[in-house]
């Protein structure tokens, strides 16, 4: 009986780790509430899908903006800074893009939202593994 309990608990622990929640950040970008989700937590070296939801001051989804994701790793001894940019595609109420993090370490991410000629940005940092 004791073995069965230990086995069941181990199985639940492994299942919980395998079903990890997305990496999620909620911040303000100017007048907008922005939620960014990366499909891997923690983000990994290689392709990572990012989904961005933007709401205006009245709580309505913003679907008429141009959204660009810029991601960079600062320079290190013997290595220049790495700077990348990817455009997003609107699908439903979410802007979606793919980021390719080329190495492990700390990455700075900026979500730039341009709407009616005005640009706002939300910045956060992730640690790719």
What are these regions (language model features)?
Residues 1-4:
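Positively charged n-region of N-terminal signal peptides that target proteins for export
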Residues 7-15:
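Bacterial N-terminal signal peptides
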Residues 19-129:
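Contiguous segments within soluble domain cores/interaction surfaces
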């Amino acid at each position: 009986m004791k073995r069965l309990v230990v086995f069941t608990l181990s199985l639940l622990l492994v299942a919980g780790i395998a079903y990890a929640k997305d990496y999620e950040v909620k911040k303000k970008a100017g007048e907008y509430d922005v939620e960014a989700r990366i499909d891997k937590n923690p983000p990994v070296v290689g392709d990572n899908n990012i989904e961005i939801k933007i709401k205006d001051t009245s709580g309505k989804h913003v679907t008429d903006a141009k959204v660009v994701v810029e991601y960079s790793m600062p320079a290190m001894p013997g290595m220049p800074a790495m700077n990348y940019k990817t455009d997003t595609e609107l699908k439903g109420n979410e802007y979606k893009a793919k980021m390719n993090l080329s190495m492990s370490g700390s990455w700075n991410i900026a979500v730039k939202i341009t709407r009616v000629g005005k640009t706002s940005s939300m910045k956060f940092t992730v640690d790719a593994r």
